[in-house]
């Protein structure tokens, strides 16, 4: 038996009382949908894949599934009695509301989501993010080999996913800095670096960066704009002072995409320079006609140098390199200062100026070194 439905034009169409079309539920993600060739917004649905009726069946019509009947409060498939498929195998687009249209194309249903996507700020299905979803329903009818129709409902649920972001560096970044050197960092070099990162993410609203947990590096400080990706770095000369001449080190800032799927290391290359050592005056004492004489010490033992591991030598005494390692006669005695900083001073007790000193009186012999 079959149920007969009379259309508006008086045409009578029979619906099979033995359901051959089966309801479909398509639970998809933006990554598992089948897209129409060349499109990012039209999906293809094989609604007849689970239908009965053999090879003689064909996709006959589609409808929005909204009943014109208010008396029964149930869907009356009157709209499905009109054949949609033309001789080309392709039907006209039919709106099912919300910016979504459907049509038959060679035995499958195409659903155009472009209107819905545009209304929600998505350029394509791939622009949907985690938590975004599309839920649509429609009905369709198949024509069986005996000429009768069978209809079913279709539910389409599409979930957005978190697509991976990509971070790249804009060419031309300055990623090198050089420590200041000389006396008290008086020889300035290049303490600044800068650049920009670009982030791309198909998901709407995800094309920006997380704020880094810290902008402080080992040798300097970064700044970073989470919207534009512009970054800068300033070397802290005090922190860099321990670096030796030519010593290479790096400071790194790791930034992440808003969704955490991508990260990028901003690496600044730092080169150390030679900071001048600081000589500190040395004092020793000797007493007239009393041991010990000579007295000794090392002038380099209390000198300082911020450069780690630097070694120092005496290069001149009283302004002359020739005095290094040789006896140098002073006012009251003789100094012998070696290049390694070791020295001895011998008071000349034979000098009248020494013997004339009263008990407790003091004089000084002063020498300079470089």
Across the structure, where does each feature detected by a protein language model lie?
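Acidic, turn/loop-rich segments in luminal/extracellular domains of secretory-pathway
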Residues: 3, 83-160, 184, 215-272, ...
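Long, low-complexity ectodomains and other extracytoplasmic segments of secretory-pathway proteins
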Residues: 14, 156-171, 266-279
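Basic, gly/Ser/Thr/Pro-rich low-complexity segments located predominantly at protein N termini
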Residues: 165, 200, 225, 234, ...
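Acidic active-site catalytic centers that drive phospho-/nucleotidyl reactions
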Residues: 51, 144, 163, 201, ...
